[in-house]
């Protein structure tokens, strides 16, 4: 038999000095490609559809991004690839194999750094093709992702409510919260799986009830919207925002649904958020920043499915003037999701013509237009820099940049 060539891939094990990287001035970097084609001789499979990423930071200062590569989203050829932005580097490495199970669809990937030296990787594994009957697997790394433990089944049934969504978080109790799509359809809502023992055992607090009527003031046991982002509020409640299952506000406009749980995910209370709904080829990020506020990154509309008269959102430029902007934006809340006084389009105004890959494809970026679609994943490093990936691009910015166009500084933001 042919001998396997030795893998020369080495990851630094030196702890990164995050404090030395801290900056107070505003930072926003131009979008940088992180999904590269592998070298032809590398043996790394690379299919035409590269999508649904996850992102985390490593203790050595590297960023680790992963995504699925496949020809068909239902396909059994699917693999999960990874790329690394090494500390101090300005270019993402070419992809490497990250996770492969022969003839199994692997939809749904999440990464987490537990701030205690361990990385967690959670992934769906199908019985065959499609993404509707997944089990969930988990593995860990204590060497910055150079090696990983053997995968362990944490939700072994091939069933619904197991489609992993990037954005795993840790509550103030030290519990892990993993959101999953509750079904394969676009309006099936989302579930949460909770681990109170650092990933050893997991429970979905769902009571088995069928999908509720997602309406203003309604309650149910499934989050409104797929691909949901979940964040813990300071009072211990969970808050989620998701895609589809839109709810009409008082003016009759369809809005992104907000779900809030005061019993750690057993029941959810639904309301219309102030944000426009998102749709196919789009996924939001919802996370709490180290500095305190809650950050939402989403899109002003769907570029094809939103009626033209409903597209765009109002933003404020540096001079305090209002303008209508389109595409990916960030919003900040200083009062636990009640209001979002800071909103900024994720562009620095430079004209660019870019290919966003996956479902995004070609788009123009300028002072009034940001990336129009993409599956988002985000993380914040200990130096307080915010890192965001879309389906093909990597962005880096900080709170100072997000607040740069803030025309009115609220008392809450001053206290933060």
What feature does the model see in each segment?
Residues 1-416:
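Asp-box/BNR beta-propeller blade signature and adjacent active/binding-site loops
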């Amino acid at each position: 038999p042919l001998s396997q060539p030795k893998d020369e891939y080495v990851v630094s094990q030196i702890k990164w000095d995050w404090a030395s990287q801290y900056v107070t001035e505003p930072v926003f970097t131009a979008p940088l490609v992180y999904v590269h084609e592998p070298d032809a001789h590398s043996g790394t499979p690379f299919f035409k559809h590269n999508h649904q990423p996850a992102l985390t930071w490593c203790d050595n200062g590297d960023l680790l991004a992963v995504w699925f590569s496949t020809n068909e989203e239902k396909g059994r050829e699917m693999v999960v690839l990874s790329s690394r932005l090494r500390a101090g580097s300005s270019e993402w490495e070419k992809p490497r194999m990250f996770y492969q199970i022969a003839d199994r669809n692997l939809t749904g990937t999440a990464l987490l750094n537990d701030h205690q030296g361990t990385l967690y990787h959670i992934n769906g594994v199908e019985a065959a093709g499609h993404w509707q009957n997944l089990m969930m697997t988990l593995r860990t790394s204590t060497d910055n992702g150079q090696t990983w433990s053997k995968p362990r089944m944490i939700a072994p049934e091939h069933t619904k409510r197991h489609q992993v969504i990037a954005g795993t978080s840790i509550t103030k109790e030290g519990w892990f919260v993993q959101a999953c799509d509750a079904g394969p359809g676009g309006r099936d809502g989302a579930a949460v799986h909770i681990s109170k023992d650092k990933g050893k055992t997991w429970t979905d607090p769902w009571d088995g009830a069928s999908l509720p009527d997602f309406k203003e003031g309604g309650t149910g046991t499934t989050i409104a919207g797929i691909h949901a982002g979940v964040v813990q509020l300071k009072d211990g409640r969970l808050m989620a925002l998701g895609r589809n299952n839109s709810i009409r506000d008082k003016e009759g406009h369809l809005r992104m649904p907000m779900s809030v749980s005061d019993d750690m995910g057993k029941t959810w209370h639904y309301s219309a958020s102030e944000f426009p709904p998102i749709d196919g080829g789009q996924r939001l990020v919802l996370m709490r920043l180290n500095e305190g506020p809650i950050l939402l990154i989403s899109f002003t509309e769907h570029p094809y499915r939103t009626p033209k008269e409903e597209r765009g959102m109002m933003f404020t430029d540096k001079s305090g003037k209002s303008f209508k902007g389109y595409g990916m934006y960030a919003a900040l809340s200083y009062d636990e999701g009640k209001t979002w006084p800071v909103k900024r389009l994720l562009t620095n105004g430079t004209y660019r013509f870019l290919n966003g890959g996956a479902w995004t494809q070609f788009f123009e970026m300028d002072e009034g237009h940001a990336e129009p679609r993409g599956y988002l994943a985000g993380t914040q490093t200990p130096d307080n820099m915010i890192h965001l990936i879309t389906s093909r691009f990597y962005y880096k910015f900080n709170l100072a940049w997000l607040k740069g166009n803030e025309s009115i500084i609220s008392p809450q933001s001053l206290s933060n």
